[in-house]
Amino acid sequence: MGNRVICMKKKDVVIRSGGDGSRSKRVNRSQRKLLADEENLHRRALSMAIHQAQVSQRFDGSMSRRIGSTSSRRGTLSDSFSNNKQVPEFLESLKVKKFVLVHGEGFGAWCWYKTIASLEESGLSPVTVDLAGSGFNMTDANSVSTLEEYSKPLIELIQNLPAEEKVILVGHSTGGACVSYALERFPEKISKAIFICATMVTDGQRPFDVFADELGSAERFMKESQFLIYGNGKDNPATGFMFEKQHMKGLYFNQSPNKDIALSMISMRPVPLGPMMEKLSLSAERYGKGRRFYVQTLDDLALSPDVQEKLVRENSPEAVFKIKGSDHCPFFSKPQSLHKILLEIAQIP
């Protein structure tokens, strides 16, 4: 398939104001309400993260979570956008309205809080999942040794969908490997797969291989990295890794708001190493028939634009979208641009 490349404007939203002063006041009030809603959402996400950090009991390992919007009622497609513009009528005809959001390494469902609110405001149905050993899933990350174990909450969510229901699967960073794994297993359940600065690997490739330019080869990383965790003791192979906070700030959040960095610093958890080092088996008959889309982040220091471009060349998706000014976490640094792209992909026939 040929690639389509769409480059989002650096400014998330452009509001055109006419000569009507009253309209300008309404827009300003709308903007203030949007900021207040976002602040409220952030407080709720922060509260959940603090609660997570204090949890001492263990929960069932297959937990999926939803972080609701600030609205007291569920939005519909006929509701207005936050800028007082009517939602396009063609959204009413969308056959697939459920988005399953899959976080990347160290993150959890909490990282999608802005995306969840925006999708719900548009009348869509976002669902998040905590992968094994991540977010509110209290599985010990040191015990997660395979991609199958890591992806189990996502696989169970897809397996429990109604027979005729399909979803749009969205993966961030190494969550892209889980998306690929799910696409190989359930191509009939996944309408579209969206990779956000993600590890869109080829058959026989490891998720870690995508980061080799930044972190060195897997073999070198396993021998020399200071970020490795030895959950079973130094005499046994490493079980996970975790970047230092200052390292993460510069690597992941170079364009993100301070409040989202603070949320991440108390929420991120160690990353299971086994799934990152596992080679994926992807077939042309199943994975190859899936509809894949890639979102590039052009100010990304964790997965450079050059590496993302290489991924697109080697594993060609149906279309490519680019977000200017976004770091490795566009759901924090450019949430409105990301939202527009998700809507646009949902509307592609």
From Swiss-Prot:
**Which top EC class applies here?**
hydrolase
Question: What are the EC numbers?
Answer: 3.1.1.-
What InterPro entries does this protein map onto?
Answer: AB_hydrolase_1, AB_hydrolase_fold, MES/HNL
- Top-level taxon of origin: Eukaryota
UniProt-annotated location(s): Plastid, Chloroplast
Q: Where is the transit peptide?
A: 1-77
Catalytic positions?
173, 300, 328
Q: Name one GO molecular function term.
A: methyl salicylate esterase activity
Query: What job does this protein perform?
Result: Putative methylesterase.
Where in this protein does the record put region Disordered?
A: 61-80
Q: Which Pfam families match?
A: Abhydrolase_6
Which ranges of the sequence are coiled-coil?
Answer: none
Q: Name one GO cellular component term.
A: chloroplast
Q: What is this protein called?
A: Putative methylesterase 12, chloroplastic
Chief location bin = plastid
Q: What is the lineage of its organism?
A: Eukaryota, Viridiplantae, Streptophyta, Embryophyta, Tracheophyta
Q: Which PROSITE patterns match?
A: LIPASE_SER
Read off the SUPFAM superfamilies from this record: alpha/beta-Hydrolases
Return the similarity comment: Belongs to the AB hydrolase superfamily. Methylesterase family.
A biological process (GO) of this protein is:
salicylic acid metabolic process
The species is Arabidopsis thaliana (Mouse-ear cress)
Keywords attached to this Swiss-Prot or TrEMBL record, sorted alphabetically, are: Chloroplast, Hydrolase, Plastid, Transit peptide
